[in-house]
Amino acid sequence: MIAAEDMYRLGSQRSAIRELFEYGKKRAEVVGVENVYDFSLGNPTVPAPDCVNETIRELTQTLDSISLHGYTSAQGDLVTRQAIADYLNQTHGTHFTADDFYMTMGAAASLSLCFRALTTSREDEFITIAPFFPEYRVFVEAAGAKLVVVPADTKAFQIDFAALTERITPHTKGVIINSPNNPSGAVYSEETIEKLAFLLRKKANEYGTEIFILADEPYREIAYDGVEVPFVTKYYDNTLVCYSYSKSLSLPGERIGYVLVPKEVTESRMVYAAIAGAGRALGYVCAPSMFQKVLVKCMGQTGDVELYKKNRDLLYEGLTKIGYECFKPQGAFYLFVKTLEEDSDAFCENAKEEDLLIVSATGFGCPGYARISYCVDEDMIKRSFAAFERLYKRYRT
């Protein structure tokens, strides 16, 4: 074969989410876009805060082209990294410096760099908690390691600690946590994070190894009803934070984020250097320079989270009224729904017959559920209820 078989497979087969999205575009050409209820993508629909476009205008008017679009240092612009450190220190009572941050092209790049930096053997394992973002498997395996999955706690969507304990071995390099969670919308409680930190310290001491938490946090600021999202570095020293501004600033196409390597991490400068080395090896040589500058002026800003909350309440109340069993999200912008048959793939195929595009959670490691993205137009949610009711009646009458 002229091309790498594993890469060909990834490139020739879209993810289930992207496949559904493309189907929706084609279906809209047939029946009209207003008749397709596309809940497939987690693509922010709340506008970016005003500071984003205002800062872009200011930068283009005051900086010359070379200063605006030229390379930053490999680890990122110093002013940007210090601004992030200052903001987190003020918000969380931490003591980070600019040297703790490595700027990246979003959380996906951050995770990929961390997996590559930490993997030292084909026997290395990273553990994730179902339901989980399916691309974790792609990123981990591309780094040469193995992904181990802990089954979902479908009562509260926290962590099944008995199942996690069974899966920690001397080969465990890290545990990936995603809170607020895609796809469930759950937020890990402080009790959960404390219990996780205790367990990992215990197991690391037992095996004489280092076990990292990789905190995947693109939804950190999107939380509802006063729910607090614990800042994990305060609970566990060996935490690497993989952050993206895609969701908080509604900038998914601009690809800007960071890896945070606190000084409390064991051999933190070695880990940081390995992440920088992974950036070289993978070709992530410079995060977008203009948007690094934009961040400085927009630190702490978010899109209007209340609009997501309004959609959450509308969708949750509408579907539960019909009879669906749903987990009420505490954060992010996804509703996790128990499917009306055990085969969630089949259920989502049946939903397509009503032009409802929802994502089976089989790929998220949680069969029997479906993800409904509510970062969509409010009117579409309202119009979709008749289709959801028809689907429900097909199973219950």
Where are these regions (language model features)?
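PLP-dependent class I/II
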Residues: 1-20, 25-63, 75, 79-82, ...
